[in-house]
């Protein structure tokens, strides 16, 4: 029995000293020498996989109390919670347990009091709170030296002060024991320091057994999963499986490093998914804002009685994307919370692996394992792709009636509707018939929100409903709200509706899946009458209302456009498309024309094939409805309510400061006031009653602008817009080039002196005609000059009454203008600088 105990003691001493046991030899030494490098590699791998966003603050949190933010020191009795956050014992309050038994052989286990973590608010039992051994050696060096000075020899029972320290045995020795240590054959080769702290080879402070006060914890009992001393292993842990400290540390570090690497890879995926969700939320918000602007541009064109009904429909349409946005918000919130938790676990585990405190690592491995396994079991749903949403509208889509304005119909392709069939005659889907297949789910009528039909003869063609519902595959009842659509402000609508016109209808065509975006269609209530379906009257027949266009709010995938014309998308990224669809004869629509090019809001304006407009042939649009009448360029245009000419704000004379109202008329159509009523004492030559020459009176200014605008819009005058070939004008020289751009600049007082009389204005125009006549030798051009002079005289006579301007249409002597030398772009306010 004694021999067996001696053998066990020798084996324990061998483990503590680090010398190779029987049969190990140099190979065992090599194995131990590679263990630190393997642990360092695993630690480096964990550090590489740890999040970079932690920074110094996250690492500082590991060494500071989560409550008082003070640095954790041994005298503050740091405690480690199961969530791997640390706090002072005093900050945790009475629920904090006393220091647990290091060897696991005794000590109070604590009660079942529930404690809230001061950092992450997770609840845990007080018995699960352990001492933070990583912070055990964080005290000042002075305190450490003072403690080492009081260390007694552990090899004898004399309690003599220790003067030396054996590195292999990790024991403080007195002078007598040092001599005995060097005489024994087994220990004579040990490294003995004359003085120094009681630390092991790795530089960490030795932890002593609570039962055997002088015995260090040098063994790891696998059966009890705890550190033991040699005496405890021979007594309380007899016949248990155990490992030497170095072997246990090496094995546990490998396991922890593997778990940290796995969690690091999963955390990287979570970070990517979180960024994608955040990006998706921003994109959904941006799409909503963009579509909201597009819808406002269309809503401003329709009639004022649509205001009341339109608000209800827009509020219903907002539910189209609401579900997806709320789901993404919840998913992002959950992912962010899990991400922060995993970041802390990774930081703590990496910090523990990088630490050289093997004892603390083994004592805390349960908590670390638990959190790593728990984090690995968390399942994060993948980010679902979202589609592209567009807004398309037809300029001539709006109707005259706001009573029973329409409805929202939800259709899901590939699903069969189990609800009652809508009480309406057969309708053709129109231009959007290929945008989705499947049945239409009628809306459920809700009390207080029905669309009353009144006396409208065509109102019975559509069910009057407002509830936004949709059916799911395999379900017989309607459930779920449509996802959110952009909000549209209708306060600026000022429209005139008549009771004998058919209201438009709102329809929602959902995507192919539950997550796809939906399609909202605004069409005339009687549009089915012109589609040529059996049972309906074709367009143009008696009793059939005219076919109207459609305004479409469109949400679709980027590369799978639903029903968009070939010109509506270019490249992989689609733009919002403003479609100008044709309307039947007699239909009236809004007057804001933006037919081609790009508008200020980024809308791409296209004209689908086969469409026509008043004044144009089949498949084409009239030039007056596509480009500016003055500069012949597209862009943001305003349309005259009478002549239907389109102008840029700067091209019109006088220049427009803001977008005019619906009933706006250009200067060519505007009725000018009587000269005598406005001018008073001013005569046609611009002189007042005192004889002092002044600039044009307001009435004469308006008349000259009207005549000049007529010249700009007159097609034969197109070559006269800018005759100057140089970059600057040179009117101060005889024969200087003169064109409509310069005349416009002087009329708008961009050149001085401005015109003081209509006669002076007429002289400049006549001089321009003569200069152009000198530049050409073609007889046709000469005849056109004569025709232009007659056109100008006619316009002047119409504006100024019976006054004859033939006498002043002669070339006056050259005049030097202070504005000479200005570039044409500085002088031109319209033809050359349209939007």
Swiss-Prot record:
GO cellular component terms given for this protein: euchromatin; heterochromatin; nucleoplasm; nucleus; protein-containing complex; RNA polymerase II transcription regulator complex
Mutation effect (residue 370 to G): Some reduction in interaction with PPP1CA
Chain positions with Phosphoserine modification: 19, 26, 50, 138, 417, 437, 439, 453, 471, 473, 479, 489, 501, 594, 683, 689, 697, 752, 757, 784, 824
Covalent cross-link Glycyl lysine isopeptide (Lys-Gly) (interchain with G-Cter in SUMO) as placed by the record, residue numbers: 554, 676, 750, 804
Stretches the record annotates as Disordered: 1-49, 411-480, 584-618, 815-835
UniProt-annotated stretches for the region RBCC domain: 65-376
Coiled coil region boundaries: none
GO MF annotation, one: RNA binding
Biased composition (Polar residues): 434-443
Positions annotated to bind Zn(2+) 2: 209, 212, 232, 237
PHD-type zinc finger locations on the chain: 625-672
UniProt binding sites for Zn(2+) 1: 153, 156, 177, 181
Residues with the N-acetylalanine modification: 2
Phosphothreonine carried by residues: 498, 541
ZnF (B box-type) intervals: 148-195, 204-245
InterPro entries to which the protein is assigned, alphabetical: Bbox_C, Bromodomain, Bromodomain-like_sf, KAP1, TIF1b_Bbox1_Znf, TIF1b_Bbox2_Znf, TIF1beta_RING-HC, Zinc_finger_PHD-type_CS
Function: Nuclear corepressor for KRAB domain-containing zinc finger proteins (KRAB-ZFPs). Mediates gene silencing by recruiting CHD3, a subunit of the nucleosome remodeling and deacetylation (NuRD) complex, and SETDB1 (which specifically methylates histone H3 at 'Lys-9' (H3K9me)) to the promoter regions of KRAB target genes. Enhances transcriptional repression by coordinating the increase in H3K9me, the decrease in histone H3 'Lys-9 and 'Lys-14' acetylation (H3K9ac and H3K14ac, respectively) and the disposition of HP1 proteins to silence gene expression. (Microbial infection) Plays a critical role in the shutdown of lytic gene expression during the early stage of herpes virus 8 primary infection. This inhibition is mediated through interaction with herpes virus 8 protein LANA1.
Protein name (record): Transcription intermediary factor 1-beta
Protein source organism: Homo sapiens (Human)
Gene name for this UniProt entry: TRIM28
């Amino acid at each position: 029995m004694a021999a067996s105990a001696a053998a066990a003691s020798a084996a324990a001493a061998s483990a503590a000293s680090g010398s190779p046991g029987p049969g190990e030899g140099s190979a065992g030494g090599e194995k131990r020498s590679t263990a630190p490098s393997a642990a360092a590699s695993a630690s480096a791998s964990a550090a590489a996989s740890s999040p970079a966003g932690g920074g110094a603050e996250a690492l500082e949190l590991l060494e500071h109390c989560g409550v008082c933010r003070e640095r954790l020191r041994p005298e503050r009795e740091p405690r480690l919670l199961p969530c791997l956050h640390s706090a002072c014992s005093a900050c945790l309050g009475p629920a904090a347990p006393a220091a647990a038994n290091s060897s696991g052989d005794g000590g109070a286990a604590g009660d079942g009091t529930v404690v809230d973590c001061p950092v992450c608010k997770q609840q845990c039992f007080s018995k699960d709170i352990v001492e933070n051994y990583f912070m055990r050696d964080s005290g000042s060096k002075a305190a450490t030296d003072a403690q080492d000075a009081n260390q007694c020899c552990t090899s004898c029972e004399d309690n003599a002060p220790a003067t030396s320290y054996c590195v292999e045995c990790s024991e403080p020795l007195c002078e007598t024991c040092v001599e005995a240590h060097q005489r024994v054959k087994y220990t004579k080769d040990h490294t003995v320091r004359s003085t120094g702290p009681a630390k092991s080879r790795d530089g960490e402070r030795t932890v002593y057994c609570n039962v055997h006060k002088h015995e260090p914890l040098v063994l790891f009992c696998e059966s009890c999963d705890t550190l033991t001393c040699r005496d405890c292993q021979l007594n309380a842990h007899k016949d248990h499986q155990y490992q030497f400290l170095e072997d246990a540390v090496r094995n546990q570090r490998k396991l922890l490093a593997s778990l940290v690497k796995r969690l690091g890879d999963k955390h990287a995926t979570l970070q990517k998914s979180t960024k994608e969700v955040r990006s998706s939320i921003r994109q959904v918000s941006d799409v909503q804002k963009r579509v909201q602007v597009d819808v406002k541009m269309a809503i401003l064109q329709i009639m004022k009685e649509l205001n009341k009904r339109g608000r209800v429909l827009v509020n219903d349409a907002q539910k189209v994307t609401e579900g997806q946005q709320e789901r993404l918000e919840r998913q992002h919130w959950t992912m962010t919370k899990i991400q922060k938790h995993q970041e802390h676990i990774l930081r703590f585990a990496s910090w523990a692996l990088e630490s050289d405190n093997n004892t603390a690592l083994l004592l805390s491995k349960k908590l670390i394992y638990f959190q790593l396994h728990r984090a690995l079991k968390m399942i994060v749903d993948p980010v679902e792709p979202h589609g592209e949403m567009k807004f398309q509208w037809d300029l001539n889509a709006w109707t005259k009636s706001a009573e029973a304005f329409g409805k929202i119909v939800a259709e899901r392709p590939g699903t069969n509707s189990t609800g009652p069939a809508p009480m309406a005659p057969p309708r053709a889907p129109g231009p959007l018939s290929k945008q989705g297949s499947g049945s239409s789910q009628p809306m459920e009528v809700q009390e207080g929100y029905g669309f009353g039909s009144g006396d409208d003869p065509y109102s019975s063609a559509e069910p009057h409903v407002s509830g936004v519902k949709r059916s799911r595959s395999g379900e017989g009842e309607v459930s779920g709200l449509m996802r959110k659509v952009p909000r549209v402000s209708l306060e600026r609508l000022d429209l005139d509706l008549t009771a004998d016109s058919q209201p438009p209808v709102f329809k929602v065509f959902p995507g192919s899946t539950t997550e796809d975006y939906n399609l909202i269609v605004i069409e005339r209530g009687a549009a089915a009458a012109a589609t040529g379906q059996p049972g309906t009257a074709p367009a143009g027949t008696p009793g059939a209302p005219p076919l109207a266009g459609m305004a479409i709010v469109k949400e679709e995938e980027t590369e799978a456009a639903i029903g968009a014309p070939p010109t509506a998308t270019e490249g992989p990224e689609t733009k919002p498309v403003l479609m100008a669809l044709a309307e039947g004869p007699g239909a009236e629509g809004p007057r804001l024309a933006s037919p081609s090019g790009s508008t200020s809001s980024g809308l791409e304006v296209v004209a689908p094939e086969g469409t026509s407009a008043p004044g144009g042939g089949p498949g084409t649009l009239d030039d007056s409805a596509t480009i500016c009448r003055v500069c012949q360029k597209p862009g943001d245009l305003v349309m005259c309510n009478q002549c239907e000419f389109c102008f840029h704000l700067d091209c019109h004379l006088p220049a427009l400061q803001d977008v005019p109202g619906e009933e706006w008329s250009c200067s060519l159509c505007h009725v000018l006031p009587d000269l005598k009523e406005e001018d008073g004492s001013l005569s046609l030559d611009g002189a007042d009653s005192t004889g002092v020459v002044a600039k044009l009176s307001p009435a004469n200014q308006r008349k000259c602008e009207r005549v000049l605008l007529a010249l700009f819009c007159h097609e034969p005058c197109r070559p006269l817009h800018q005759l100057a070939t140089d970059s600057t004008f040179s009117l101060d020289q005889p024969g200087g080039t003169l064109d409509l751009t310069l005349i416009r600049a002087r009329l708008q007082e961009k050149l001085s002196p401005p015109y003081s009389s209509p006669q002076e204005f007429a002289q400049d125009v006549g001089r321009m005609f003569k200069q152009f006549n000198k530049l050409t030798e073609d007889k046709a051009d000469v005849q056109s000059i004569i025709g232009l002079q007659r056109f100008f005289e006619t316009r002047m006579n119409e504006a100024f009454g019976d006054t004859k301007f033939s006498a002043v249409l002669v070339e006056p002597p050259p005049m030097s203008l202070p504005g000479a030398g200005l570039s044409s772009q500085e002088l031109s306010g319209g033809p050359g600088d349209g939007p």
